[in-house]
Amino acid sequence: MPSTSRAGSLKDPDVAELFFRDDPEKLFSDLREIGHGSFGAVYFAHDARTSEVVAIKKMSYSGKQSNEKWQDIIKEVKFLQRIQHPNSIEYKGCYLREHTAWLVMEYCLGSASDLLEVHKKPLQEIEIAAITHGALQGLAYLHSHNLIHRDIKAGNILLTEPGQVKLADFGSASIVSPANSFVGTPYWMAPEVILAMDEGQYDGKVDVWSLGITCVELAERKPPLFNMNAMSALYHIAQNESPTLQSTEWSDYFRNFVDSCLHKIPQDRPTSDELLKHMFVLRERPETVLIDLIQRTKDAVRELDNLQYRKMKKLLFQEAHNGPAVETQEEDEEQEHGVGRTGTVNSIGSNQSIPSMSISASSQSSSVNSLPDASDDKSELDMMEGDHTVMSNSSVIHLKPEEENYPEEPDPRTRPSEPQSPPQVSRHKSHYRNREHFATIRTASLVTRQIQEHEQDSELREQMSGYKRMRRQHQKQLMALENKLKAEMDEHRLRLDKDLETQRNNFAAEIEKLVKKHQAAMEKELKLMANEEKKFQQHIQAQQKKELNSFLESQKREYKLRKEQLKEELNENQSTPKKEKQEWLSKQKENFQHFQAEEEANLLRRQRQYLELECRRFKRRMLLSRHNLEQDLVREELNKRQTQKDLEHAMLLRQHESMQELEFRHLNTIQRMRCELIKLQHQTELTNQLEYNKRRERELRRKHVMEVRQQPKSLKSKELQIKKQFQDTCKIQTRQYKALRNHLLKSTPKNEHKAVLKRLKEEQTRKLAILAEQYDHSINEMLSTQALRLDEAQEAECQVLKMQLQQELELLNAYQSKIKMQAEAQHEREIRELEQRVSLRRALLEQKIEEEMLALQNERTERIRSLLERQAREIEAFDSESMRLGFSNMILSNLSPEAFSHSYPGASGWSHNPTGGPGPHWGHPMAGPPQAWGHPMQGGPQPWGHPSGSVQGVSRGSTMGVRNSPQALRRTASGGRTEQGMSRSTSVTSQISNGSHMSYT
């Protein structure tokens, strides 16, 4: 539930279901106050529905800090609803009425501290073991559910009629473990709780420490440092050694158990589960040890209440017969009895810094619960008290069960002369019936004294409550600041992560855009290459067709010309017969036609070879051009990735610096606030100590003034006592004088009687004068002695008080100095740890950057390697195919763009790198341009009449054919392939990285 909700508001359904809506005043009757504390009061009551006896703890949530009180009530109710164990108090419900919460629980007889209060002596070891065992079982249950009680003491360990031990008062409990609140009762508080805000968190082992202190309390009637101011006790616990059992009569098991519980370092302290296995609680003991103890205590309570009753009857009887002027021995006796009953008060009270706590360890509850948790005597449940206590505003009349039914009946054992009481049997039945409803181990005087102290010591309680409130407020401020800075840090980290993610997304989009651009460029280039190849092939075919037509026309002309020449030759040679001429002419024509057919076939073959060769060359050049383009695109993409990675790493370093600066600023802010809060806390502690010193001195002065005022009465009493002694002496002397006179008168003659009487009279007068002088001297000596003794006693008390207060002030200064040193050491440690974390984070970041750069470089190398390998495989496959088709690599790679431009206009422009890269990709140019197809043979064939010309022409054609044959291609390529392969494999990465293309020539 949010702390800002109004106190008592039930709008939140989670809160509303914690409380019953019935009117508690109609459900519970016969309410009798049986305990009191800063939280409110505890009442005995009957449940009208079931006639069950219950205890009701009334807690107001109005007035100052109402919201905090309301939150504490909610927390306690939630805690009680969560627990269910035989050794924890049974919760029955909670009701709301007029800004007061009625917390209903099972009724118990009283607390372990009530046992000490009644018997005025420590418990036996087996009794302590039994109580401790039950408390440990309850603590083990709480700790197993990550719950912490935080206020274990004898006053919060209750006992039931069957001897069951119950843990009670969960107003200080914590629902989470570990916790870090300043909560508990000072004398029982563990060191880590006192230093919670300064040194960190604590867990259920704080209850183990409190249990150890409780064992000391049960063994010595009060906890350690109980004669010290509560605030001073806190400082002492925080910085001094752990307490131990003082007496040597206790067993080694008990001593070891207490020492184990009171280990100063929590890590060395055993858990509640481990302590359940300790021999101190496992040793064999009578099962009825607690039942017997409770019965003895109930009997003692009955006797004490009977004694009070008899005193009251005696006072009333004396007033009725002798008037109110009866003082002396009875009064003194009553005072002595009062001292006996409240021995803890009188023996400790003068040194007790918190008078409200000076009753006994049980009432000693300036419980430092977080605020109203501070149930002073949250013997909440002791609540559960005994004989009927009839409350009338501030007066309390505590009646025995018998007296409730027979108010005028005297005790037959102490007043035998009184009238006969009703039959004993009926009285026992009545007593049993009332005990069944309101059995208790608390005396009426304890309840009355508790209420009176609560009314009187509000100033001290308010000071402690204010100190606890301040500590809790400081903790809230520090937690609020830490949460604020944590939120700021998370927001800053999210912003940086968002910036980094945005940059990465932008980079990814840029890379994706670049890849798509490259894909489009590659597709465009492939289409362009296909078109260029088609155009190139068409251009060569058109040129060859033109050359073929020209060649055929030339052959026709040559044929016609040759035919005419042959005719002329035949006409000139008249001697040859006509038939022979015709035969010779036909044969010449046939030879010439055959020669022309061969020439045409050779031309077509050469054209086909040339077309295939040039197309193969063109394809190879296109392949190399595509490879160059791929290299350019890959290089551009890799360079882009490198640039992006550099920018990303620069941003990571900037973000690291930004986070480092923010972390140091936050740490400085927290440490500065912590120092301010410690300074304010120390100032408050010093102010409280000085106020406490003034109050102690004021109380001592008031006491001395009262002693001085009461001195005349005391002197008058002593003077009357001396006067009485003098009167007794005078009476004795008078009797002696009369006896001597009678004796002398009998033994002396009658005529001498007058002289004897005169002499005796003078002797008597002289002795009375001496006695009067002694009386005056005794009075004067008594007056001077008493005044001197009073002055000396008061001066000694002043000196003792000053020394004690000075020691407490020095203890406070030492504690504060230690806290300051610890805070400084903690701050230095935090700065050192932050520097280590930052440097480690920087080293990890630099390592990550280095790894990413190495991974990027490896990726770059792998991309280039795989690209070049793929391109090499493509070139090799192309060259293998070319070799299979009969083309040599040398021939394919020895065509210069200039030579190519003669036969293919526009090709030279295409041969340039499409991406603007370096020009020459194709290896070595050819030695010279190819001969025009229109002049296949220099000089032409010889006239048909000269066969040598034809032979020469054929030999040239055959030479051309041999040069273009697969065998020749293989021979020319055999010497250069290894060299080319080597040139491809060298400096692959550097060439692409530097922007140069690889040529596979």
Curated annotation (Swiss-Prot):
Question: Does Glycoprotein show up as a keyword for this record?
Answer: no
Catalyzed reactions per annotation: L-seryl-[protein] + ATP = O-phospho-L-seryl-[protein] + ADP + H(+); L-threonyl-[protein] + ATP = O-phospho-L-threonyl-[protein] + ADP + H(+)
- Biased region (Basic and acidic residues) positions are 375-388, 577-586
Q: Where would you find this protein in the cell?
A: Cytoplasm
Please list the coiled coil stretches.
458-651, 754-877
UniProt keywords (A-Z) are: ATP-binding, Cell cycle, Cell division, Coiled coil, Cytoplasm, DNA damage, DNA repair, Kinase, Nucleotide-binding, Serine/threonine-protein kinase, Transferase
Of which family is this protein a member?
Answer: Belongs to the protein kinase superfamily. STE Ser/Thr protein kinase family. STE20 subfamily.
Stated name of the protein: Serine/threonine-protein kinase TAO1-B
Species source reads Xenopus laevis (African clawed frog)
